[in-house]
């Protein structure tokens, strides 16, 4: 599953107010409203099209070929799993795919609305069929399987093939609940409520939903960071910028019927719990003292409305971990106000023998970061640390000015980043103060979620030879977006009945390193690459549809501060020797082997109860064995079952632990270098 990397989101969509209202059971297709374009949408479409075609960094023609691509994307947004529409439905509308560009320019979006209305009808038929399937006896003893990802599969050719897909879907839903311990009666009651609720949702869909989906299909076909924001999402964007969110600190998105964790806000309740990961699915939400509400199939904004609440109140989330497992867990979080100021740099000191390494954990490039880092550097200097590690893992970026000024703390002066617009004009952003605030050994730790401003800093430190970069190749987001309202001053005078018209966010520039290479797609390749664990590996700009290409420009004029390349072989040798014996890295290597062995089958799950229970038990047994291995090494009493795990238990961080050791290796080598140079000069 590719995710859209949103650098503007502080707590995702957790401030969206959903609309939930009572609706009687929908039993006929004619009870589903036929959605039509609202009067303001024609103007909005014209303005969006004009903005994208004239001002976007990627220069493109909204011709028939591009129109066809928009159609295909819209189709997949409507029916991601290819289990709602028939092949004949797709074929019927495919004849009109080349006219979408004209529709966007004129604002007459007939194809978009007609196709959406057909999908609504087909979705109603599917859930009606699913309710009938629930009446059948449950049997989980066969060898059936279910494909979790049908996004590349052909559309079903007839209703019989479609029914077979939904037989499997219902069986998957039933088995997922059975594995949580529910009885057959409870399973039927839960799924009946879920499917009827999904049908009622169809009656609550409005014209803006169709329009937003059409604009999203258009925007995403240009590049993955270009967006149309509906009036509601524009309000949310402005709320985020005013730093007044209250929630759990997570960016959410829909994936088929599931609400999925897209990313976590550093310092927020979800991140601090250490119990929620990117890719996890929220399947239930419960308020204090109230029963858990099944939210599978809900609209995203309504799930968000349940999660939101007053600061200090508690919310329970039923989490289905990423992957194909079906064992859920309940997590209780205390809602907090998510403010950018709360995401400040955190300093710690790691001791290895008699030596000390300072660690600066930077979750985001907020305004004021550089001044905060100066203060922490002074504290570390007083503690006489041997080396410093800057941890940029999961740092999605932030203020470009802070990336430049932070880089300036570690070099005398010089260009930090080059920025080019779509006219080819290049500017340099430089450090000019001539002051170095820290001259000692420096290591920067990155991962696949380090993006944008993080990559600018890491690239500058690497190009200047100022720091050793370790970890995973970074995300590869090397573009700049601009936000613009679609409202005009005269709108309210001429059309006072119109609501707000929303806004757009689109790409206008690209970043380039001082060596001339772009950070786009390729990101920053570490000097020492750590093995990647068992998480989803297809994360990064190069996996996003329509990501702008990598390219290069002339290098800026800069003078390297140092050259760490001669230390590379020795540092790598020591690193490899350590991780070959480190139990935590041995776990990681085994997970990699397991992941690769199952790669082709990771989306195919068994619908056999005994097989699935065996898989779940094996996962639990593996985790328990590893925890007990750690406890044994630490001299702690062993656990009999996972339920006995202390609530304050924290998983080790082998990547940071190893980076600290690399930082000490670098300090030793840099200390030896002057003596070697003096001997060579004699």
Swiss-Prot record:
It is a peripheral membrane protein. Its EC number is 3.4.21.102. Residues 1-22 form the signal peptide. The keyword Signal applies. GO terms for cellular component: outer membrane-bounded periplasmic space; plasma membrane. GO terms for molecular function: endopeptidase activity; serine-type endopeptidase activity. Involved in the cleavage of a C-terminal peptide of 11 residues from the precursor form of penicillin-binding protein 3 (PBP3). May be involved in protection of the bacterium from thermal and osmotic stresses. Belongs to the peptidase S41A family. This is Tail-specific protease. The lineage of its organism: Bacteria, Pseudomonadati, Pseudomonadota, Gammaproteobacteria, Enterobacterales. The gene is prc.
């Amino acid at each position: 599953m590719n995710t859209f990397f949103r650098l503007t989101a502080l707590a995702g969509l957790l401030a969206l107010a959903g609309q939930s209202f009572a609706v009687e059971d929908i039993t006929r297709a004619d009870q589903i409203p036929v959605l039509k374009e609202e009067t303001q949408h024609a103007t909005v479409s014209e303005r969006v099209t004009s903005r994208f075609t004239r001002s976007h960094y990627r220069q493109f023609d909204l011709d028939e070929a591009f129109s066809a691509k928009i159609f295909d994307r819209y189709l997949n947004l409507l029916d991601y799993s290819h289990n709602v529409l028939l092949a004949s439905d797709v074929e019927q509308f495919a004849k009109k795919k080349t006219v979408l560009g004209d529709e966007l320019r004129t604002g007459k979006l007939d194809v978009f609305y007609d196709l959406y209305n057909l999908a609504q009808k087909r979705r109603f038929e599917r859930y009606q069929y699913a309710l009938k399937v629930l009446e059948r006896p449950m049997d989980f003893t066969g060898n059936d399987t279910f494909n979790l990802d049908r996004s590349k599969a052909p559309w079903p050719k007839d209703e019989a093939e479609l029914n077979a897909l939904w037989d499997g879907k219902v069986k998957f839903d039933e088995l997922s609940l059975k594995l949580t311990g529910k009885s057959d009666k409870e399973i039927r009651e839960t799924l009946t409520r879920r499917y009827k609720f999904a049908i009622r949702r169809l009656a609550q869909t409005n014209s803006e939903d169709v329009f937003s989906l059409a604009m999203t299909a258009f925007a995403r076909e240009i590049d993955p960071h270009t967006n149309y924001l509906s009036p509601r999402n524009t309000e949310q964007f402005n709320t985020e910028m005013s730093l007044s969110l209250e929630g759990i600190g997570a960016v959410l998105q829909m994936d088929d019927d599931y609400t999925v964790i897209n990313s976590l806000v550093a310092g927020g309740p979800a991140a601090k719990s250490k119990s929620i990961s990117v890719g996890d699915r929220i399947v239930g939400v419960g308020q204090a003292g109230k029963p858990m509400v099944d939210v599978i199939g809900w609209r995203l904004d309504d799930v968000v409305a349940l999660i939101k609440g007053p600061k200090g109140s508690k919310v329970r989330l039923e989490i289905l971990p990423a992957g194909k497992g079906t064992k859920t867990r309940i997590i209780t979080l205390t809602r907090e106000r998510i403010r950018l100021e709360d995401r400040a740099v955190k300093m710690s000191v790691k001791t290895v023998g008699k030596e000390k390494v300072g660690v600066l954990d930077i979750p985001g490039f907020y305004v004021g970061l550089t001044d905060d880092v100066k203060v922490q550097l002074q504290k570390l200097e007083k503690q006489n640390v041997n080396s410093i590690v800057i941890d940029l893992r999961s740092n999605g970026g932030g203020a470009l000015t802070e990336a430049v000024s932070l880089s300036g703390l570690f070099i005398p002066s010089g260009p930090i980043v080059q920025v080019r617009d779509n006219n080819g004009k290049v500017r340099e952003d430089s450090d000019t103060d001539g002051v170095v605030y820290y001259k000692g050994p420096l290591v920067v730790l990155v991962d696949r979620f380090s993006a944008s401003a993080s990559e600018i800093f890491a690239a500058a430190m690497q190009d200047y030879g100022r720091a050793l970069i370790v970890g995973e190749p970074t995300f590869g987001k090397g573009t700049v977006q601009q936000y613009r309202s679609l409202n005009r001053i005269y709108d309210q005078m001429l059309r006072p009945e119109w609501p707000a018209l929303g806004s757009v966010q689109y790409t206008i520039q690209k970043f380039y390193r001082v060596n001339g290479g772009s950070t786009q797609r390729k990101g920053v390749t570490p000097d020492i690459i750590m093995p990647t664990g068992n998480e989803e590996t297809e994360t990064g700009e190069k996996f996003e549809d329509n990501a702008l290409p990598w390219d290069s420009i002339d290098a800026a004029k800069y003078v390297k501060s140092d050259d760490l390349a001669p230390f590379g072989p020795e540092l790598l040798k020591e690193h490899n020797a350590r991780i070959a014996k480190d139990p935590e890295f041995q776990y990681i290597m085994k997970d990699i082997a397991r992941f690769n062995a199952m790669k082709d089958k990771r989306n195919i799950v068994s619908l056999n109860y005994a097989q699935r229970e065996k898989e779940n038990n094996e996962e639990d047994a593996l985790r328990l064995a590893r925890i007990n291995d750690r406890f044994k090494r630490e001299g702690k009493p062993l656990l009999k079952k996972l339920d006995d795990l202390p609530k304050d238990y924290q998983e080790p961080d082998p990547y940071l632990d190893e980076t600290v050791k690399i930082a000490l290796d670098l300090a030793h080598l840099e200390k030896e270098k002057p003596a070697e140079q003096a001997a060579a000069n004699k």
